């Protein structure tokens, strides 16, 4: 059994109106877009990805997203639903210097998924830096 079996990976590109979800199992990729902040729709898409990849409903999910204006409530929501999440420092993400860099939510989500897979499946250590998620009270004090 390989390391990636029985795991689903999800990268999220969060924007004001929509969230781009990019799922993978180490072999295939599936992208979906949902309205921002819709927890039930997010969980429905996670279930559909597991089904599409032929995995059990209780298959663990590992996810990531870039730290940004949404703060850390998304991380807490994912954790509350049994999803293991890391919040990535956007400044730590490698950017191709030579090639012209196209920026779309679809491409960004796919790149984030690739980084998550490199770290989780192939053990690459310096793929990205993880942000320490503050508690709710600490986050509220930071916003003042």
Q: How should these model regions be labeled?
A:
Residues 1-6, 29-32, 55:
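Intrinsically disordered, low-complexity and often Lys/Arg-enriched segments
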Residues 2-24, 112:
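Gly/Thr-rich phosphate-binding beta-strand-loop-beta motif of the actin/hexokinase/Hsp70
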Residues 7-9, 59-62:
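Short active-site oxyanion
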Residues 14-42:
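Short glycine-rich, Thr/Ser-proximal phosphate-binding strand/loop in the N-terminal lobe
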Residues 40-61:
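Short, basic/hydrophobic alpha-helical segments
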Residues 61-73:
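Acidic, metal-coordinating catalytic cores used for nucleic-acid/nucleotide bond scission
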Residues 71-89:
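TOPRIM-like Mg2+-dependent DNA-processing core and adjacent phosphate-binding/basic surface
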Residues 87, 91-144:
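Long, charge-rich intrinsically disordered scaffolds of nucleic-acid metabolism proteins
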């Amino acid at each position: 059994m390989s390391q990636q079996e029985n795991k689903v990976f999800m990268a999220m590109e969060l924007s004001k109106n929509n969230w781009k979800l990019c799922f993978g199992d180490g072999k295939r990729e599936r992208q979906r877009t949902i309205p921002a902040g819709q927890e039930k729709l997010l969980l429905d898409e996670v279930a559909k990805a597991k089904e599409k990849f032929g995995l059990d409903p209780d298959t663990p999910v590992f996810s990531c997203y870039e730290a940004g204006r949404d703060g850390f409530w998304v991380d807490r929501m994912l954790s509350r639903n049994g999803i293991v999440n890391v919040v990535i420092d956007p400044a730590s993400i490698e950017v191709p210097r030579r090639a012209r860099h196209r920026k779309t939510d679809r491409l960004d989500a796919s790149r984030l998924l690739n980084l998550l897979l490199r770290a989780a499946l192939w053990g690459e250590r310096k793929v990205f830096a993880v942000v320490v998620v503050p508690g709710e009270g600490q986050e509220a004090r930071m916003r003042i």
